[in-house]
Every structure is written in structure tokens, then in C-alpha cells.
Amino acid sequence: MLGAGGVLYLTPMVFHQAHFSAGRVTEGLALAAVAGTLGRILCGVLLDRGLNCSVPVLMAALIAIAGDIRLIGTEAFGGYLQGQLLLGIAMGLYWPAIELAVPLSCAPVSSARAFALARSADALGIATGALGGALLAWRGLLRGVYVVDITCLLILLLVLLRRALPDPRPQDRLAHPSPLGQWLPALVPMLAITVLATAMPALMQSALPLDLVQGGLMRRALPESLGALTIGLQLGLLLLIQWPVGQALARRPVTTGLTLSLISFALGNLLLAASAFTTWGLPVLLLAQLPLALGEAAFLPTATEAVVELSPIEHQGLAMALLSQCFAISGFGAPLLAGRLLDAQGHAVGLWLLMALACLGGLLLVRDLAPRRTFG
């Protein structure tokens, strides 16, 4: 995730430098989100039929390298869309496989603790990548984030070619799966919560960088290097708190983590909106990064653990594909909405207030979930 950190969070700034409008930047991000839809479902179905998790991850790495190469050298909107299309397909193949690999690889550690550790590793990679991207932005080499990503992907290819991911699933369960109607309805509220909650990381990758460089109602616009550092601050906070938060929530029902996440996101959005109403908005904006990081730290391991609890082992590939598809739905819709609001209003106050209300409303869905583990 080190290379992905720079690509995910700093691509909007790369093409802001190329004089793309907010709408065009977010259209590319939305295309990337929707491009992996078929790949996700296909990946999930094949995983449930016994495909080793290593195969989709290897394919994703090769496609992502092609996408990075396309984005390095283009200044045209068409080239930008092509690069985002390739990255979207790669993410579609990657996420169901890598998420399923966590519970399959973690014995004798519980899957909840394993997801907390995996999310901590993700946070380390993304934060390091984004901070490295901020340094590249300061040096005027912002497109270097794609070179970093290619390097990391090549290392991933070498590691997986030397040692494949384990797959201890019982073949008799895979050969005789339970009907979808026995488990899918119970998963639906969790998927709806995921669409809502994952809109926040999508907006942190798309709308927040543009909000920072455009400025608020009274808040001054930030230079691109300082904007990248602000995003890096949130990712650094996420890195610091991901492991302790994930460990604490691993001992509690999934509803606890989801409630904490939605409340934290609502508070962070309110602070982001408030930062636009003063010339001294930067301290308020920086303060908002704390609840936003807490919300993400609480949600990411809890959501994947909830899916494991709510789905049988022979359908967990498809369940992880549906979970990652929720990321894609919010990744498609949230940037499009954000781009339209930013272009129409010239600021992001309405966007942040809308998201705060949506997160508070999402608490109603949490009540429909029930923990499936015993806690002591």
C-alpha cells in the first residue's frame, strides 16, 4: 500500500496541475471506481470455486503497473481516463482476494485481530506513500508517485511468485455451498453501512485535496505541497491509532466499532464545514483530521470482520467481492457529487454538511446488525 498511498491521495493534485476542472478530476476517479465491478464479482465467484487468492493479486499488480505508466506521461483527459480505468480494474481484482486471504492465513490468531493488523499495515503503507508524495510535491516531482507505485508493485510480484498465499478452506464446503438466501439478507444492512462509510475515504482522496487547493468561503487556498501535508497528517494519525483502536474493537461486538466510526465521521465533517467560515480555518481543518482518522480506524477492520461473521466460509469470496463493490459504489458516487458541488458552489461546505447528516442517519442501520461472536 506504500505506492498506492501516493497514487490514491495525490492523483487529484497531479491533474489539478494539468488544469483539469474538479468535475473532470472526479469523473476519472469515479470511472476507476466503477471499472472494477465485473472484476470484483468474477474474482469473488472464482475464489468460492477454489481459486487461490494469489492469482487475482498477481493479475492486479500487472494491470496497475500499466495504469501507472499511462498516467505518468499524459496531460490529456483521454489518457487520464485510460489510466484510471486500468487502476480501477486492478483494484477490482485485488481487494476481494487480499481480504479473503486475511482470515485464511491468520490461524491461530482470531480473524478480528488479524484484520486489525492488516489495516495497520495498510495505514503504514498509505501514510508513508502520501507523505512521500508530499515530499515529491515540494520538490516539484508530483508524478513521481507513479514511479514509487510501480516499484512497490514489482516487489509484490516477486514476493508472490516466490511464495503463494495459503488456502486451507475445506473442499467439501466449496463443492456444496449453502443457498444465498440463507446468509445474504443478513449481510444487506452491513453493505448499506459500508456504502455510506466508505464515501468518506473516497472524499478524502477526491474532494478534500480539491477543497484545500481551492479554499473555503473565508479560508485561504493552500499550496499543493501544504495540502498534501495536511492529507498526510490524517494518514499519520490513522497509522498511530489503527492498531490500538483495532485491537480494542476486536474484543467488542461489531456494532460498537460501526457506531464509533459513524459518529466520528459526522464530527469530522462538521469541523471541515466549519473551517470554511473563518480566515483562521486551517487549525479547525487540522483538528478535523483526528475524528476522521478515528472513524476510518474504527470502520475498516470492523467492516471486514462483520462480513466474515455474517457469511459462510464457502461464500466468503463473493461476500468480500460485495464488500469491495460497496467501496466502488461510494467511490463512484461520492466523487461525482463532490465534483458537481465544488464546481457549482466554489467551496465544499454543503458537501461536508450533507455527509455529516448522512453519517448520523446511518446509525439507524447499525441497529439491524447483531454480533455473532462471544466476548469475554
State the predicted function of each range.
Residues 1-33, 189, 198-218:
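Helix-loop boundary and gating motifs at the non-cytosolic
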Residues 15-16, 46-47, 135-140, 248-249, ...:
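Interfacial helix-cap and linker-helix signal at transmembrane-aqueous boundaries
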Residues 39-52, 240-254:
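Helix-to-loop junctions at the C-terminal end of transmembrane segments
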Residues 55-69, 256-271:
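Structural signature of the two symmetry-related core transmembrane helices
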Residues 87-122:
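Cytoplasmic helix-loop-helix junction between adjacent transmembrane helices
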Residues 87-98, 291-303:
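Core transmembrane helices of Major Facilitator Superfamily
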Residues 145-161, 351-367:
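Symmetry-related core transmembrane helices of the 12-TM Major Facilitator Superfamily/SLC fold
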Residues 315-343:
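A late C-terminal transmembrane helix in Major Facilitator Superfamily
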